[in-house]
């Protein structure tokens, strides 16, 4: 699968096309296993790109996932269709801007490796509480808000975001106080990034009044997956945190 995907991306010849590293998918898969213990759940990716995140998640997990993939890029949508058909994986593929209204049911889990940079549609960004007061709005903040919009009452957003986004602009602080819970911030290993400005974190978000996760924020840095003992300890700490709710 990875070979076919990389070959297809090379043929599309667009330098902006990239895939979510498999190790990040592994981390998210383990988090979902801790949360849902292989229950049947609905999972949507709102920035699915090549579909790599979803397909690796389905392959790595023992759970039964009802998958929905959303991406604005036509080439990515066609690529996903071909690869998911080849792998005989049932996925609903929606080819549209994920920050526009979506005709999908509320989800148990929403994942996204959210895009860097700014959202080009200033008019649509005005529909979001996390839009910028002036100029273009950050993609990451809008994706966080949109994920919250489509979670069911006890759903969990598991989002890979630039860590610098968490330096909390005023409107994000207000959004956290009034609209959602930021339940966990899990910083990815430093070695995965060329410099500090590129560093990412996995965040867990839920709606107010949810009962799925503890409200006390879980803060951690994931050890390298090569450090098996350290990684096992991280998973144990995460499970202990879950038991506190």
Predicted regions and their residues:
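A short acidic, Gly/Pro-enriched loop at the edge of an enzyme's catalytic core
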Residues: 100-111
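Conserved SAM-binding loop
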Residues: 80-81
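Flexible, glycine-/basic-rich loop-and-beta segments that form/coincide
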Residues: 197-245
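Conserved Class I SAM-dependent methyltransferase catalytic core
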Residues: 136-191
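Mobile active-site "lid"/loop adjacent to the S-adenosyl-L-methionine
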Residues: 114-143
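Conserved SAM-binding strand-loop segment of SAM-dependent methyltransferases
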Residues: 88-98
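Conserved SAM-binding motif I beta-strand of class I
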Residues: 66-71
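Class I S-adenosyl-L-methionine
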Residues: 1-61
């Amino acid at each position: 699968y990875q070979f076919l995907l990389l070959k297809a991306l090379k043929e599309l010849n667009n330098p902006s096309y990239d895939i979510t590293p498999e190790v990040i998918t592994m981390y998210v898969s383990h988090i979902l296993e801790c949360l849902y213990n292989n229950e049947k759940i609905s999972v949507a990716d709102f920035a699915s790109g090549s579909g790599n995140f979803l397909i690796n998640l389905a392959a790595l997990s023992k759970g039964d996932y009802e998958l929905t993939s959303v991406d604005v890029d036509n080439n990515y949508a066609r690529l996903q269709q071909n690869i998911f058909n080849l792998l005989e994986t049932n996925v609903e593929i929606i080819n549209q801007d994920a920050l526009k209204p979506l005709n999908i049911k509320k989800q148990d889990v929403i994942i996204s490796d959210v895009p860097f940079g700014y959202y080009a549609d200033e008019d649509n960004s005005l529909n979001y509480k996390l839009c910028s007061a002036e100029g273009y709005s950050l993609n990451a903040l809008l994706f966080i808000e949109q994920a919250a919009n489509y979670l069911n009452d006890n759903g969990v957003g598991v989002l890979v975001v630039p860590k610098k986004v968490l330096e909390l602009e005023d409107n994000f602080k207000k959004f956290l106080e009034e609209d959602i819970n930021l339940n966990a911030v899990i910083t990815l290993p430093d070695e995965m990034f060329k410099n500090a400005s590129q560093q990412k974190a996995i965040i867990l978000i839920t709606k107010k009044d949810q009962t799925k996760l503890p409200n006390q924020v879980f803060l951690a840095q994931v050890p390298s997956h090569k450090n098996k003992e350290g990684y096992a300890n991280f998973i144990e700490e995460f499970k202990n945190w879950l038991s506190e709710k």
